[in-house]
Amino acid sequence: MMMEEKLVINELELGKELANRLMNNLKHTSSVDSNKTLISDILRIYQNAIFMLSFNQDKNILKRSLEIDGKDSKNVFKKRKVSEKNTEKVKVFVATEQENGSIDDGHCWRKYGQKEIHGSKNPRAYYRCTHRFTQDCLAVKQVQKSDTDPSLFEVKYLGNHTCNNITSPKTTTNFSVSLTNTNIFEGNRVHVTEQSEDMKPTKSEEVMISLEDLENKKNIFRTFSFSNHEIENGVWKSNLFLGNFVEDLSPATSGSAITSEVLSAPAAVENSETADSYFSSLDNIIDFGQDWLWS
C-alpha cells in the first residue's frame, strides 16, 4: 500500500472518531462551543482526505501521460531506423560514373542541392526524379562519396518511382582497321573488325584509325599500288599488293593501331603510288560507310 493511501485512511478514521464524539455530545447536554469545534475539525479532516485523493489522481494521470510520451518517442526512433535501412552502397566504376559524380541506376535524376556534412570530407548531393512535375514522381535520393574509398558511393533512396520513363545504358561500336594476312585471296587485304563494348554513351559511332609515327614509317607501304578500276560499287577488290613480299605483313595486335612493318620487298611496279596516296584511297573506302564487304 502506498504512503498516500495510508495518510488518507488515517484522516478518515480520525474524522469518524470526531463524528462519534459529536453524536455523543448531542445526546447529552453539552456546550455549543465544543460542538462547533468538533464540526470544524471533522470538515477539515474530510477536506484533507479529498485533497490527497485528488492529488494522487493527478499524479497518476501525469505518470500515464509520461509513459505514453515515452512510447511515442520509441516509435519515432524505430521509424527513423526503418527509414535508414533503405540504404545501399553501390560500387561505381569509371565506365559507369557520370560527369557530375552521380551513378547510373536506370532512372533519370536531376540534382537540386548539395550540402557540406560535418565530419565528412565529401559533400552530400540531393537528387529528385526528372519527371517530378510532368508525371508527379516524388522519388528522391541522396548521394555521398565515401571518405575511405573514392569509388564507393553511399546512396539513400526516399520514395519509389511512379514514372514510366526508365533509361538503359547505351553501347558504342568501335571499328578497328588492321592489316591481316589471308590465304583466301591472292594478296593481303584490309579487314574491318567490329567490337561492341559497354562504354560511356556517345551520339554516333566512330571509325578510329590510329597512325603512329606516320612520317617515320612511310617505307612500310612503298610497294602498294592502286588503280581507279579496283574500287567499284563500294567493294575493294582483291589485288591490294602487286608482287610477292619476302616477309609476310604481320597483323596489328593492338586494338585499332596499324603497327605492321615490311622487312623487304621487290622493286616497285609500274604505276605504284606512295603511302600518301594509299591513305587517301583508304579514306575514300571508309567514306562508303559500314556496309562494304569483300567481293
Swiss-Prot record:
The keyword Transcription applies. The gene is WRKY46. Binds to BZR2/BES1 to cooperatively regulate the expression of target genes. InterPro entries: WRKY_dom (IPR003657), WRKY_dom_sf (IPR036576), WRKY_plant (IPR044810). It comes from the Eukaryota. Phosphorylated and destabilized by ASK7/BIN2. SUPFAM superfamilies: WRKY DNA-binding domain (SSF118290). Induction: Up-regulated by drought, salt and hydrogen peroxide treatments. Induced by salicylic acid (SA). Up-regulated by E.amylovora. Triggered by P.syringae. The keyword Transcription applies. Disulfide bonds: none annotated. It comes from Arabidopsis thaliana. One of its GO terms (biological process) is lateral root development. Expressed in guard cells, hypocotyls, and in the vascular tissues of cotyledon and root. Mostly expressed in roots, at lower levels in leaves and petioles, and, to a lower extent, in stems, flowers and siliques. Residues 98-166 bind DNA. GO terms for molecular function: cis-regulatory region sequence-specific DNA binding; DNA-binding transcription factor activity; sequence-specific DNA binding; transcription cis-regulatory region binding. This is Probable WRKY transcription factor 46. Keywords: Brassinosteroid signaling pathway, DNA-binding, Jasmonic acid signaling pathway, Nucleus, Plant defense, Transcription, Transcription regulation.
